[in-house]
């Protein structure tokens, strides 16, 4: 016959066992939306290499509205660089940061030599916005930032970029907000209004459809080369 002490000890162990089994069942499950928001990537998860070869995390621009553009100094659309300068000058105080990423992927219309690239954007184009090193923006060598920006599941519809001067607006939380193709001129009043609305948090997430597989591509003439 078990003693009173033995029965108490056995009852105590049974009680502990019940608690251990019941606690996970009673604990509130995490909201799936919360789980999604925690795992959702932003541009702040990526970094770029600047014209001097130094890596810069995009988290440096937290809280800013970003306009990310792939540049091409030899393109017939290179006058858009002046328009980007104007946007940076006009809206910097309100929180706009223009980010330019040169690339020779589209028609080979960018300088590949780092010294020539630095000289062009600093001395010829007088870029007043952040210009990074020449990068691959499609194919097997596509940089991680552009894999993210062109992934419809994580970012915006539209797929791989089609030509130079494709523009991505990224909100102050680091989430892609809108995409515009080369034929959307940043010098236009309408584009300035778009930026103003985005700065004010009034622009809804959207995408401008590309007009063909090589939307807005430079013509084949050599007039501007």
What are these regions (language model features)?
Residues 4-15:
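Bacterial N-terminal signal peptides that target proteins for export
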Residues 15-24:
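Bacterial N-terminal signal peptides
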Residues 60-76, 98-102:
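Short active-site neighborhood of thiol/selenol oxidoreductases, capturing the structured segment around
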Residues 77-142:
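Structural microenvironment flanking redox-active thiols in thiol-disulfide oxidoreductases
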Residues 147, 151-225:
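Thiol-/selenol-based redox modules, centered on thioredoxin-like
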């Amino acid at each position: 016959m078990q003693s009173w002490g033995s029965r108490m000890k056995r009852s105590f162990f049974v009680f502990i066992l019940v608690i251990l089994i019941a606690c996970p069942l009673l604990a509130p499950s995490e909201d799936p939306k919360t789980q999604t928001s925690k795992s959702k990537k932003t541009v702040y998860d990526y970094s770029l290499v600047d014209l001097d070869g130094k890596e810069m995390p995009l988290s440096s621009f937290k809280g800013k509205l970003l306009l990310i553009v792939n540049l091409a100094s030899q393109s017939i659309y290179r006058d858009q660089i002046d328009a980007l300068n104007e946007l940076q000058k006009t809206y910097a105080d309100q929180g706009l940061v223009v980010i330019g990423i040169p690339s020779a992927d589209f028609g080979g219309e960018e300088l590949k030599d780092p010294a020539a690239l630095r000289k062009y954007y600093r001395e010829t184009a007088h870029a007043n916005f952040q210009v990074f090193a020449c990068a691959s923006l499609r194919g097997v060598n596509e940089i991680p930032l552009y894999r993210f920006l062109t992934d419809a599941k994580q970012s915006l519809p539209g797929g791989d970029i089609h030509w130079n001067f494709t523009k991505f607006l990224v909100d102050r939380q680091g989430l892609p907000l809108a995409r515009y193709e080369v034929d959307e001129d940043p010098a236009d009043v309408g584009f300035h209004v778009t930026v103003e609305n985005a700065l004010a948090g009034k622009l809804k997430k959207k995408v401008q459809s590309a007009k063909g597989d090589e939307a807005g591509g430079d013509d084949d003439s050599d007039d501007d080369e």
